[in-house]
Each structure stands twice: as C-alpha cells, then as structure tokens.
C-alpha cells in the first residue's frame, strides 16, 4: 500500500473517531452539551467499510470484485468484521437494506433500494 493510501486511511480513521461522538448533533446543541469524553479507539461504519474495501481490493490484486466486497460488507454487518469492538453500529438505512437484500439472495445489481429517498447519506 502506498504512503498516500495509508495516510489517507489514517486521516479518515482519525477524523471519524474524533467526529463520531458529535455525529448528528447541531453546533447549537453542542454549545449546551459539548462532547467532553471520548472512548479511545472507537470509529464508525465509515472507517469499517473503508477497511473492508481496501481488504477486498488488496486480496483481489487491486481489482474491484463486487461479490467479494459485498461479502465483506455483509460480514461487517453480521459479525462486526473490521470494527473496533466486534459489532457494527451507526449503519445507514439504505446501506443496511442493501446488505440485507444481498444476504437474502437478491441479485447483486438489484440490492440497492431505488427511490429518491434512498439517495442520501447512509
């Protein structure tokens, strides 16, 4: 892995760990209830799914294998693969639905929900 990729992933993980406790909170609410304590080594689905993607690419000679990638994502959801505490958390509704579809045998190209409400973050 090149230094650029490694540095990018480390930056993502650090930013994710620092931002995760404040996720979904407004600046206004943080004025009255600031994040004062943070658990060490905790990151969200953003870092875990990035690590899954990199593991898949690395194991497949840096070629994208959608089935391998989805298997790793499903392993993350079901078993906490590449999570800090062995459990997936902070999963978005669209991501969860797509992975559940995959686990239930829906063809890969049909796993993602297809309506305008599923185009957001998560």
Locations of the language-model features?
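Structured, active/binding-site neighborhoods that engage oxygen-rich ligands
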Residues: 1-122
């Amino acid at each position: 892995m090149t230094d650029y990729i490694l540095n990018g992933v480390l930056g993502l993980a650090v930013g994710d760990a620092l931002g995760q406790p404040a996720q979904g909170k407004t600046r206004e609410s943080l004025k009255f209830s600031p994040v004062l304590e943070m658990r060490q080594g905790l990151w969200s689905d953003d870092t875990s799914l990035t690590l899954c993607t990199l593991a898949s690419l690395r194991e497949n000679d840096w070629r994208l294998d959608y089935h391998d990638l989805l298997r790793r994502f499903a392993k993350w959801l079901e078993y906490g693969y590449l999570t800090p505490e062995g459990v997936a958390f902070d999963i978005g509704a669209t991501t969860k639905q797509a992975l559940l579809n995959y686990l239930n045998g829906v063809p890969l190209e049909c796993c993602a929900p297809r309506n305008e409400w599923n185009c957001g973050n998560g």
